[in-house]
Amino acid sequence: MKIYRQIKQSFSITKIVFSFFISLLLNLVAQPTICQAFPIYAQQAYQIPREATGRIVCANCHLGKKPVEIEVPQAVLPNTVFEAVVKIPIDKGAQQIQANGQKGPLNVGAVLMLPEGFKLAPAERLSEELKAKTAGLYFQPYSADKENILVIGPIPGDKNQEIIFPILSPNPETNKNVKYLKYQLHVGGNRGRGQVSPTGEKTNNTIYNASVNGRISEITKLENGGYEITITTKNGESKIETIPAGPSLVVKKGQTIKADQPLTIDPNVGGFGQMDTEIVLQSAGRVQGLIAFFISVVLAQIFLVLKKKQFEKVQAAEMNF
């Protein structure tokens, strides 16, 4: 009986350990790594993704400049769903340097800063057409208390050069913090990996330069695919420059170089861009009043023409008399 209990206890411990490793493995597979989910950098480091100067903080890591566009309606009614279309064009066939040094397809991502009160439209408010346009896209608020700031990415760039955000406009009748006014929207969009990590270190998706003057005395290829370049100065001191896997060298052994001279090509094919636009939260009563005004103007013009014709007829009759 004692042996049976020991075997049973041993089996239970083995089962628990096995379950733990299975759970850990599933988490590693299911969750993206921090180098893949670049929006998390800004979310962790900045309370809001736009600085006082108007610069969106993504530009701190994505140093290349590329265009981005946004299209929204000129005006929207309260409590309605509309589309905000963010366009992030990429070069067809362009491939980026991945973290392991290999080339791969470009990813894209975007951050959309809406006015206070505007937010991501709930699924039950989407039309079938809008559901089809946003299928497979996962939008999330920048933080729990910033529902008006939305982020998405990384997602495949070849299939998502246009990202449609389904937005729900606020209702000033129920939200007293919102007024019928013209508001600004800010969008930032990037394609490809950054050149600087949040800690300030270079990634392998940027150019590497020499830090001193001297002569390249040795180039050693590392097991991980990178290089160690030994530069000997005039004083006989040796400076080792470490190049990660990815960037290709543009120098060779025996070459004399100067400080800040490129040691590698610039492998970055991506970049970041931002754009501002405006949208009007329009009152339905104002629209109805405007329509009524236009109708009254048209009717007044019609009556004026009829009155003029009537006057001309009377005047002609008097002249004939």
UniProtKB/Swiss-Prot annotation:
It holds the Pfam family Apocytochr_F_C. GO terms for cellular component: cyanelle thylakoid membrane. Keywords: Cyanelle, Electron transport, Heme, Iron, Membrane, Metal-binding, Photosynthesis, Plastid, Signal, Thylakoid, Transmembrane, Transmembrane helix, Transport. Binds 1 heme group covalently. Residues 1-37 form the signal peptide. Heme binds at residues 38, 58, 61-62. It is found in: Plastid, Cyanelle thylakoid membrane. Its cofactor is heme. Its main location: plastid. It is a single-pass membrane protein. GO terms for biological process: photosynthesis. The chain crosses the membrane at residues 287-306. GO terms for molecular function: electron transfer activity; heme binding; iron ion binding. The 4 large subunits of the cytochrome b6-f complex are cytochrome b6, subunit IV (17 kDa polypeptide, petD), cytochrome f and the Rieske protein, while the 4 small subunits are PetG, PetL, PetM and PetN. The complex functions as a dimer. Belongs to the cytochrome f family. HAMAP family: Cytb6_f_cytF. Component of the cytochrome b6-f complex, which mediates electron transfer between photosystem II (PSII) and photosystem I (PSI), cyclic electron flow around PSI, and state transitions. This is Cytochrome f.
